[in-house]
Amino acid sequence: MKEIKERLAALRKAMKDAGVSAYIIPGTDPHAGEYIAEYWKERQWISGFDGSAGTVALTLEKAGLWTDSRYFLQAGIQLKDTTIDLMKEGLSETPDIISWISKELKAGDKVAVNPQMFSVNSYAKMKKTLALSGIELVSVDLLKNIWTNRPTLPQEPFFVYDIQYAGESVEDKLKSVRSEMKKLHANVFALSALDDIAWLFNIRGNDVDYNPVVIAYALVDENSATLFVAPEKCTPVSLEFLHQNQVNVSGYEDIYDALKSIPADKSVLVDGDKFNQSLFEAISEKCTKQFAMSPVFRLKAVKNKVEMNGVRKAMIKDGVALTRFFMWLENKVKKENLTEMS
């Protein structure tokens, strides 16, 4: 695992240059996703562990990977000879990440994280807990200049999810969201969860394996809505659809300027468990912040008649596929020895 050791050494050099004593790398993305695009697989790149759940924390001398029991065997194999210790979550003898860091560092030391990769709530909790030991949490991306051959963000165009499948128009969905915003006394709603955005704007994509989502952000206010997405992902058809539904389109990174430009007298609604700290820091301190579960999360949980019918059709197809598998298995097991990989 020479390559992993070299990456750890490069990161530790960056830590020293930045005056940082520890760095935390989760296995998520700026949208609080568990299943993520290759571009954001930072934890996998630094450790070699490619399970869907896990976090790496390292100091200038030690490193550990925290993951749950699903991955104890896999992580043990993939971390071999990397100098990264496997920290088995759920066992009484395993300290949590912040407790481990607090023990390894001293008062006055700094811990760094990429604020894009942590939700507002998780960042605040870490900051508060570390402060009890006199340790400061700082926002800095130390991997951007180290991971030089990083994959590009997905560029495949997204597509419109037709109302015959969605069962509700974008106009009606925005009306429902604005009604919920009014109840929460919010002028602006900032969205970052990809499933929420796909549902609200009736769009789908192939940006994340096995998840039909589009990498984007969104802002909804009392009179307008804006989708922040890479221009190359838009087609004439999708742009026309969004414009017909009074949805503005801007570049993916333009979300930061949009957040900074929100007037100081406005109230901004964010889901603290989903919205990342980097975006949150872009909002003026003078703006009022409302923290609540995303209204979209609740709205999309209640299925309309079209969606329920779609589920029924999907279950029929799923049942046919499972029946075919059972038939195949019943015939094969009589003739040969089968394994999980057969």
PLM regions with names:
Residues 1-342:
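Terminal domain-start leader segments
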